[in-house]
Swiss-Prot record:
Belongs to the TRAFAC class translation factor GTPase superfamily. Classic translation factor GTPase family. EF-G/EF-2 subfamily. SMART domains: EFG_C, EFG_IV. The gene is fusA. This is Elongation factor G. PROSITE patterns: G_TR_1, G_TR_2. GTP binds at residues 17-24, 88-92, 142-145. Catalyzes the GTP-dependent ribosomal translocation step during translation elongation. During this step, the ribosome changes from the pre-translocational (PRE) to the post-translocational (POST) state as the newly formed A-site-bound peptidyl-tRNA and P-site-bound deacylated tRNA move to the P and E sites, respectively. Catalyzes the coordinated movement of the two tRNA molecules, the mRNA and conformational changes in the ribosome. It comes from the Bacteria. Coiled coil: none annotated. The lineage of its organism: Bacteria, Pseudomonadati, Pseudomonadota, Gammaproteobacteria, Thiotrichales. Keywords: Cytoplasm, Elongation factor, GTP-binding, Nucleotide-binding, Protein biosynthesis. HAMAP family: EF_G_EF_2_B (MF_00054_B). InterPro entries: EFG_II, EFG_III, EFG_III/V, EFG_IV, EFG_V, EFG_V-like, EFTu-like_2, G_TR_CS. GO terms for cellular component: cytoplasm. It comes from Francisella tularensis subsp. tularensis (strain WY96-3418). Its main location: cytoplasm.
Length: 704
């Protein structure tokens, strides 16, 4: 069966932004204008199509990325029909993981900013993630009808705070309640959308006289940006100072695809102005699956390889999200990078080493589904019937095995103990938590060995609230939740050499493992700029510790790292070098050397000046000027370090670094200080040493 839409007419895009920039409303309008939903769902009515979980509709925020397929032929029907697969991503910092997963499988993104608040903390996080995956993007400055909205100010903020080369392709006509429409800088015409039909039709009129000069200045900057795409365009521009509309599109597209520039559009999704122009921008400037570099992967032997985006290549797809559906059970969302998959086909999962059969394939529209017979390169769809797949697994052809890059997921920073309200629910709770953990890799579940309690960990208080809420609604398990606990870590501060000997020789075969290990602080970071946890170096010469036991020493040290040495918290930032030792021909074993390794760390870390680390959060508080002093005083009392201040239309913005341990219940507190007018957001920044008096308390409570 041939393809319905040619691959170059595909656009796999994400819509990402900070909470409240109007991202879900923008997506709703896209679905309305592309003809998918006949009635527009408003977020503040709790009726948005993409926000399909009950909690999302109650809280008015998007938690999980819903995926939707839609079609667009242009505002003036000027394009052939393009297929747009859209992923709507959450903007709350506790759900960064959902954004990370979506960006991993997208080819392009529309980043939405609020016209009055501009660049906010989550916008920076999203931008960093998009940079990490090299995702070309365009910007939509939304809410131009809001008080304090200023398109050019937001573009300037994107330049300075996100270090992005922003090129406006539009200019707003009026702002706040006078926002009327936009100037198209390529056609040099004003676009006025018709309010009677919710912006379905529009007229092109002359540019208002008072904006003519500014529009011409911005047009020149835009043409210069387009001309820099190639020598031919630059020559033509230098000779005549002008480029045709097609040449401008061609130049801008080439530079967006190379991640050299970011085009800026503006409008108000809520007022039905500007969204169709953004759709034209998606088709014109964002890449098709075969216009981005071939996906990198590895063969089974760990050799680097790549897969072109083509139906003729062997099948390869990435499972980027799991969801539990009340009617069909487990849904596995996949992005197909190459080849074709038909329902009923068997696929191989090289990460698990298992073969599975795909029962049915469905195309999702938020939480409604259409069954389809097959998916091809470039498609995003959900499979039903896969049992043993986790987020980040590769699915491929068993005859041609590849492993697509693994996704890196952040470590949780907050934990709470949960217990079912009735003993009868214990098993139900275990099943529910297991399913939720399979869906969300930034959520972890473990049993505390000492207390026997179930401990759940995640990215923030809201994240864990929603998990407990979903247990109640979807799995009918009522639970009691303990006070939040901080995910402390331990590390060492100095270099030490440690001998450890494990010897058991009392009749029969004994045990003998003897090692000398040098421990020192590890100051290395991984490719994401995060501190490395552990590095093991083998410097043994002359076979004093036989090759087959060296891995066991490393394993023993690594297992002991998980238990810590001061207060039972996992250790990070440790480099261990095995440089000497001895063995016994008969009594030595892998187990003996593993125990010797763990003994070496236990003894050595105490001498190496071990200390406790705590998560430090980057906190941004927006407060009216009147409450500035009180809010800053409160942050100082919480051991906060004020890093700087900015202004924005709603008041002052305080940037601070504050220990997570001091931030519990802050939301209620900051509301009462400011009579409900201040808001804040926070994300994990780094681990730092805990002050001695607090470290003593932590150790004391662990030992008691």
């Amino acid at each position: 069966m041939p393809r319905n839409t040619a691959l170059e007419k595909y656009r796999n895009i994400g819509i990402c932004a900070h909470v409240d920039a109007g991202k879900t409303t923008t997506t709703e309008r896209i679905l309305f204008y592309t003809g998918l939903s006949h009635k527009i769902g408003e977020v503040h009515d709790g009726a948005a199509t993409m926000d399909w979980m009950e909690q999302e509709q109650e809280r008015g925020i998007t938690i999980t990325s819903a995926a939707t397929t839609t079609f667009w032929s242009g505002m003036d029907q000027q394009f052939e029909k393009h297929r747009i697969n859209i992923i709507d991503t959450p903007g709350h910092v506790d759900f960064t993981i959902e954004v990370e997963r979506s960006l991993r499988v997208l080819d392009g993104a529309v980043v939405v900013f609020c016209g009055s608040s501009g660049v906010e903390p989550q916008s920076e996080t999203v931008w960093r993630q998009a940079n990490k995956y090299g995702v070309p993007r365009i910007v939509f400055v939304n809410k131009m009808d809001r008080s304090g909205a200023d398109f050019e100010r937001v573009c300037a903020q994107i330049k300075t705070r996100l270090k992005a080369n922003v090129v406006p392709v539009q200019l707003n006509i009026g702002a706040e309640e006078d926002f009327k429409g936009v100037i198209d800088l390529i056609r040099m015409k004003a676009i006025m959308w018709n309010e009677e039909d919710m912006g379905l039709t529009y007229e092109l009129v002359d540019i208002p006289a008072d904006l003519q000069d500014r529009a011409e200045e911005l047009r020149m900057e835009m043409i210069e940006a387009a001309a820099e795409a190639s020598e031919e365009l630059m020559e033509k521009y230098l000779e005549g100072g002008e480029l045709s509309e097609d040449e401008i599109h061609q130049g801008l597209r080439a530079r967006v695809l190379n991640n050299e520039i970011v085009l800026a559009f503006c409008g108000s999704a809520f007022k039905n102005k500007g969204v169709q122009a953004v759709l034209d921008g998606v088709v014109r400037y964002l890449p098709a699956p075969n216009q981005v570099p071939a996906i990198k992967c590895e063969t089974e032997d760990g050799e680097p390889a790549s897969r072109p985006s083509s139906d003729d290549a062997p099948f390869a797809a990435l499972a980027f999200k799991l969801a539990t559906d009340p009617f069909v059970g487990n849904l596995t969302f996949i992005r197909v990078y190459s080849g074709v998959l038909k329902s009923g086909d068997a696929v191989y999962n090289p990460v698990k080493g298992k073969k599975e059969r795909v029962g049915r394939i469905v195309q999702m529209h938020a939480n409604k589904r259409d069954e389809i017979k097959e998916v091809r390169a470039g498609d995003i769809a959900a499979c039903i019937g896969l049992k043993d797949v986790t987020t980040g697994d590769t699915l491929c052809d068993q005859e041609d095995v590849v492993i697509l890059e693994k996704m890196d997921f952040p470590e949780p920073v907050i934990s709470v103990a949960v217990e079912p309200k009735s003993k009868a629910d214990q098993e139900k709770m275990s099943i529910a938590l297991g399913k939720l953990a399979a869906e969300d890799p930034s959520f972890r579940v473990k049993t505390d060995e000492e207390s026997g309690q179930t401990i759940i960990s995640g990215m923030g208080e809201l994240h864990l609230d929603i998990i407990v809420d979903r247990m109640r609604r979807e799995f009918k398990v009522e639970a009691n939740v303990g006070n939040p606990q901080v995910a402390y870590r331990e590390t060492i501060r100095s270099k030490v050499e440690q001998e450890a000997k494990f010897v058991r020789q009392s009749g029969g075969r004994g045990q003998y493992g003897h090692v000398f290990v040098r421990f020192e602080p590890l100051d290395e970071v991984d490719e994401n700029g995060e501190a490395k946890v552990f590095k093991f170096v083998d410097e043994v010469v002359g076979g004093v510790v036989p090759k087959e036991y060296i891995g066991s020493v490393a394993k023993g040290i690594e297992e002991q790292l998980n238990n810590g040495v001061l207060a039972g918290y996992p250790m990070i930032g440790v480099k261990a070098t095995l440089y000497d030792g001895s063995y016994h021909d008969v009594d030595s074993s892998e187990m003996a050397f593993k125990i010797a390794g763990s003994m070496a760390l236990k003894e050595g870390a105490k001498k190496a000046n071990a200390c406790i680390l705590e998560p430090i959060m980057k906190v941004e508080v927006v407060t009216p000027e009147d409450y500035l002093g009180d809010v800053m005083g409160d942050l100082n009392r919480r051991r906060g370090i004020i890093e700087g201040m900015d202004e924005n239309p709603s008041g002052r913005v305080i940037n601070a670094l504050v220990p997570l341990a001091e931030m519990f219940g802050y939301a209620t507190n900051v509301r009462s200080i400011s009579q409900g007018r201040a808001s804040f957001s926070m994300e994990f920044k780094k681990y730092a040493e805990v002050p001695n008096n607090i470290a003593d308390e932590i150790i004391k409570s662990h030992n008691s």
